[in-house]
Structure formats: structure tokens, C-alpha cells
């Protein structure tokens, strides 16, 4: 039997949207799949037109509301990444994937797709789009660290006292900026995995950082199967008294997606061993 994805690929004239892989991907309970792309590298008009054909009417309307073309472009590539990758896990053609939202607006696959055990999360900034796929709650964040703003002032307003103190102890601006984005991406990944907004209170939880350096996902050496394994860096979350969560229920790791693009993943563990994170660059075209 020819899979829906294979039929779609044939109809598109054999165009490749992500690297050639088995027609159906499975993410195990102890595994997180991480996909990333630089939207600036995707410029072929025919490919952009094909990706636009995947968008729902609601997505096309959202895309049209961006004032600048570069932001419309980044949105298109990010949605193309989501639809192209998730089609490989669900067996559903990219344009036929349907989404719903949780109580706080987190996108989820629609129940009628029969993929209740599949979770995903997207993060994008100018220059990077990142998608994680897992079997339980998962969140990812990537930031462009060159953006303006005083990290210490932002941290003083939003972060826990322990994190503010740790930033104050650092000797130079570069170190403080790096540490700020480490904290910020970990916090964002956690609240996205929880499916809630910043109303959770970024000062209600903080992180003890691991001793390991963050892996540069963009510099990884893929194995014969095309995946690179990302080493866990050992971050631990701490909660304010009375906060309704348990530190041991969560796995965290920090990483980068090339110079100037720090990131982090948060995933629910539910008593299981720490998951394996494997990464792959998603090639469109």
C-alpha cells in the first residue's frame, strides 16, 4: 500500500520537503526528536509556493497580518517545518493536518487525526525555527541573543531572586548576557511544555545550571541515520513554596543552534529515565 505521504510526494513531482526518511517516523517514550532550520536559506519561489499551499485559511490570514515580508517569510517556513515534519509521524499529508489549541492557546494536533500520543512544540526567531516532537509534554525555545535590552534589568523584573543574584555576580556584560539567555530559554521551554503563559510567574521557579557546556546543534556530526545525539547538560528546576509542580517530573537541557542562537528543551519525565535527544536539520528543497 502506498502511504499518504508517498502519494503526496508523487503528486508534487517528487519534490523533497524534508530529508529522505522512512515513510513513518515513531518517537519513543524515552526520546525527543529535534528539528531545526534557518528560514533565510529557503528562497526558491517554487518551493515557497508549495509551502504556501499547505497553509490553512487561518494560517494564511495570520501570515498576511505581518507588516514586513521577512516576517511573513519566517512564518511560512515555520509552519512548513511543522506540517512537513509532523506529516512523517502521522502519515497525514501536510496540507491535511488539522490543529486545535489548549486552554491557554498551545497548538495541538486535532483529536480526529488519531495521534493523541504525539506532542510537539515550535519556537522561532529571526534566523532559526525549531520543532520538537515527543510522546509527552515538551517545550522548546530559541532566541536571537543579539537583540537589544539590558539583561540585568529584565531579570530584576521577571526572574527569581537566586537568578538575579547569580547574574549580578558575573564579571562582565558578555557573561551576564549569556547567562540571561540560558535562564530565559529554560523558563520559556518550561512554560511552553506546561501549556501555560507567563502568567505562571517567571519568579516562581528557577534553575540550578548543569556543569556541561551546551551542545551546538548546528555543528553536530550526524550518524548514518542522519541524526545527531545531543548531550544532556544537567539543569535542575526549583520551585517556590506552594508551587504546584515537582522538580523530579522534569528533564531540561540547554543547547545552541549556532552562534547567537541559544536554546533549551523541557520535557515531562513521569518517573522515567532522562530521554535521549536526537537532532536533525530539516532541509526544505
PLM feature segments, named:
Residues 2-285:
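Core catalytic alpha/beta fold that binds nucleotide/phospho-ligands
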Amino acid at each position: 500500500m502506498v502511504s499518504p505521504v508517498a502519494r503526496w510526494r508523487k503528486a508534487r513531482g517528487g519534490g523533497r520537503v524534508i530529508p529522505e526518511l522512512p515513510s513513518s517516523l515513531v518517537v519513543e517514550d524515552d526520546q525527543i526528536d529535534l528539528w531545526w532550520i534557518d528560514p533565510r536559506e529557503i528562497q526558491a519561489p517554487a518551493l515557497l509556493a508549495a509551502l504556501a499551499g499547505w497553509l490553512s485559511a487561518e494560517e494564511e490570514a495570520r501570515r498576511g497580518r505581518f507588516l514586513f515580508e521577512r516576517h511573513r517569510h519566517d512564518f511560512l517556513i515555520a509552519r512548513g517545518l511543522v506540517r512537513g515534519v509532523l506529516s512523517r509521524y502521522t502519515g497525514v499529508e501536510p496540507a491535511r493536518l488539522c490543529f486545535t489549541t489548549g486552554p491557554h492557546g498551545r497548538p495541538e494536533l486535532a483529536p480526529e487525526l488519531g495521534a493523541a500520543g504525539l506532542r510537539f512544540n515550535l519556537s522561532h526567531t529571526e534566523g532559526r525555527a525549531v520543532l520538537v516532537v515527543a510522546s509527552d509534554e515538551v517545550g522548546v525555545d530559541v532566541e536571537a541573543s543579539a537583540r537589544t535590552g539590558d539583561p540585568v534589568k529584565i531579570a530584576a523584573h521577571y526572574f527569581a531572586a537566586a537568578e538575579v543574584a547569580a547574574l549580578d555576580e558575573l564579571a562582565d556584560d558578555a557573561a551576564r548576557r549569556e547567562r540571561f539567555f540560558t535562564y530565559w530559554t529554560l523558563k520559556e521551554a518550561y512554560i511552553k511544555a506546561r501549556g501555560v503563559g507567563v502568567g505562571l510567574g517567571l519568579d516562581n521557579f528557577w534553575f540550578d545550571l548543569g556543569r556541561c557546556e551546551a551542545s551546538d546543534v548546528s555543528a553536530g556530526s550526524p550518524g548514518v541515520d542522519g541524526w545527531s545525539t545531543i548531550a544532556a547538560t544537567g539543569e535542575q528546576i526549583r520551585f517556590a513554596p506552594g508551587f504546584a509542580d515537582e522538580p523530579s517530573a522534569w528533564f531540561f537541557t540547554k543547547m545552541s543552534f549556532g552562534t547567537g542562537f541559544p536554546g533549551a528543551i523541557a520535557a515531562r519525565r513521569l518517573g522515567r529515565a532522562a530521554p535521549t535527544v536526537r537532532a536533525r536539520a530539516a532541509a526544505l528543497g
